[in-house]
Curated annotation (Swiss-Prot):
This is Type 1 phosphatases regulator ypi1. It comes from the Eukaryota. It comes from Aspergillus clavatus (strain ATCC 1007 / CBS 513.65 / DSM 816 / NCTC 3887 / NRRL 1 / QM 1276 / 107). Belongs to the YPI1 family. InterPro entries: PPI_Ypi1.
Length: 172
């Protein structure tokens, strides 16, 4: 037979421990079996505040409806666009340099081809083969020759597109 003993609970704690110990103790073998019973929080804080109301998001009157869909969300979605100089368009790439960059192996007034299909002309006789290959690829002299892929046209992502409403065609 075993008896069940309950440990005293603190006033601020909602969990308790029950320890079961055997009644008869044999000196040769002590066998202890324990049962741990866990209970959830009773729903109040130490100051008597109800947790069910404090854990939920409360929307103030100035919260804007998320994209007109009748939903309010606590997630913040920001799309960062890097600041650009006034004359630079958003379609220009930050990684590529223009063909007017000076190459140490070429004359600055020599036309340097920037695409694979362009003919080198005088530039092929004055530039080293590695520099010419870099210039035909459109990369600057200091960059590696591995960027041969053309960049795809950038389209707006899901957060930048306006949602389509089924009930109101053409409005919004």
């Amino acid at each position: 037979m075993s008896r069940t003993q309950q440990a005293p609970m603190n006033a601020g704690s909602a969990s308790g421990v029950q320890v079961a110990s055997p009644l008869s103790q044999d000196n040769s073998t002590i066998r202890v079996s324990g049962t741990l019973r866990l209970r959830g929080d009773n729903g109040t804080r130490n100051n008597g505040e109800d947790l069910t109301t404090t854990r939920h998001i409360r929307w103030s009157e100035d919260v804007v409806d998320n994209e007109g869909m009748g939903k309010k969300s606590s997630k913040v979605c920001c799309i960062y666009h890097k600041d650009r100089p006034v004359g630079e368009s958003s379609s220009e790439s930050d990684d590529t340099d223009s063909s007017s960059d000076d190459c140490s192996d070429c004359d600055s007034d020599t036309r340097i081809p920037t695409h694979k299909g362009d003919q080198g002309g005088e530039a092929s006789s004055r530039c080293s083969p590695s520099r010419l290959a870099e210039r035909k690829c459109g990369t600057s002299c200091s960059k590696r020759h591995s960027k041969q892929r053309s960049r795809r046209h950038m389209s707006p992502n899901a957060y930048e597109k306006m949602p389509k409403f089924k009930g109101q065609p053409g409005k919004r």
